[in-house]
Amino acid sequence: MKQNIHPNYQPVVFMDTTTGYKFLTGSTKGSKETVEWEDGNTYPLIRVEISSDSHPFYTGRQKFQAADGRIARFEKKYGKQ
């Protein structure tokens, strides 16, 4: 196995800028900005605009549009009497 070709996998804190929610996970992404976590250790901080805490799909605030099927659109367009 070649040495020094693998990315540095480390614990980092991701912060949702919309809600302020933070979570600690492992990542190869680095950051110059750091934050002190609940365990007293300092980790790199990565800010994200959307996470599972703010995304409508995960929060249950997603709105579904009624999608007509192909037959329904055909009947609507050409009229079924």
UniProtKB/Swiss-Prot annotation:
Pfam families from the xrefs? Ribosomal_L31 (PF01197)
One function term, GO molecular function aspect: structural constituent of ribosome
Q: Which UniProt keywords apply?
A: Ribonucleoprotein, Ribosomal protein
Any one Gene Ontology BP term = translation
Q: Note the superkingdom of the native organism.
A: Bacteria
Q: What SUPFAM superfamilies does the database record attribute to this sequence?
A: L28p-like
A GO cellular-component term linked to this record? ribosome
Keyword Hydrolase set for record: no
State the InterPro entries in the record.
Ribosomal_bL28/bL31-like_sf, Ribosomal_bL31, Ribosomal_bL31_B, Ribosomal_bL31_sf
Q: Which HAMAP family match?
A: Ribosomal_bL31_2
Q: How does it assemble?
A: Part of the 50S ribosomal subunit.
Recorded family membership? Belongs to the bacterial ribosomal protein bL31 family. Type B subfamily.
Protein name per UniProt? Large ribosomal subunit protein bL31B
Tell me the name of the encoding gene. rpmE2
